[in-house]
């Protein structure tokens, strides 16, 4: 039977291997960045691929099983790795409309980039449109942002951050292509469905995946 010292040495060795693997992963991400930089035009667009992120997280959760660390730990760990990779690929500036959405986007991106709060929804959206900031976090009860999204073809919702502590969730939006979204993604739409999200702004959710002129964005459901 091994003693504490031997076991701790093993743990330290595993930690070093994990660090080396993460450093290697970051170098690969830099290679991905180079390719994306060469293929994107001059008009800013987020490199983030929600479909790829959903696929990675789902595969991780399905792989780990029920032994050892809980699935929530693996989800948070890989969510942090993915977000760190997002920031390696692009120098992203984060914006939030309130303290709640600030905390959510700060946690979502692994506390690696400090967001800025702009409570004026029109000003916040304008700074997103003009690329002063690149991702905007807002609460699902913010009807002003929904109204601005209705008249915009570039800025789209691409993620939702859910918390157990409150009813209103946080949406993330930015200049992103919706082409990569597919089922089981959920559509945020102005077309009336049986799942209303914001009555004041006439915004709905649709699980019948279809991107059309009424689509304000899409997001994937949680994998755990």
Spans of features found by a protein language model:
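Domain-level signature for soluble enzymes in the chorismate/prephenate branch of the shikimate pathway
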Residues: 1-224
């Amino acid at each position: 039977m091994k003693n504490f010292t031997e076991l701790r040495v093993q743990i330290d060795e595993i930690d070093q291997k994990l660090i080396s693997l993460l450093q290697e992963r970051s170098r690969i991400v830099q290679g991905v960045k180079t390719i994306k930089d060469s293929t994107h035009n001059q008009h800013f667009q987020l490199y983030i691929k929600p479909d790829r992120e959903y696929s990675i997280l789902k595969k991780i959760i399905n792989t780990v099983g029920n032994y050892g660390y809980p699935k929530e730990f693996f989800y948070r760990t890989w969510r942090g790795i993915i977000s760190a990779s997002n920031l390696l690929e692009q120098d992203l500036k984060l914006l939030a409309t309130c303290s709640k959405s600030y905390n959510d986007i700060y946690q979502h991106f692994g506390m690696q980039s400090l967001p800025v709060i702009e409570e004026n929804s029109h000003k916040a959206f304008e700074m997103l449109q003009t690329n002063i900031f690149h991702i905007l976090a807002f609460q699902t009860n913010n009807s002003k942002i929904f109204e601005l999204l209705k008249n915009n073809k570039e800025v789209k919702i691409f993620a939702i951050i859910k918390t157990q502590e409150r009813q209103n969730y946080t949406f993330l939006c930015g200049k992103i292509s919706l082409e990569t979204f597919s089922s089981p993604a959920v559509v945020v739409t102005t077309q009336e469905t049986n799942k209303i999200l914001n009555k004041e702004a006439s915004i709905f959710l649709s699980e019948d995946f279809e991107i059309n002129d009424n689509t304000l964005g899409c997001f994937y459901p949680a994998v755990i």
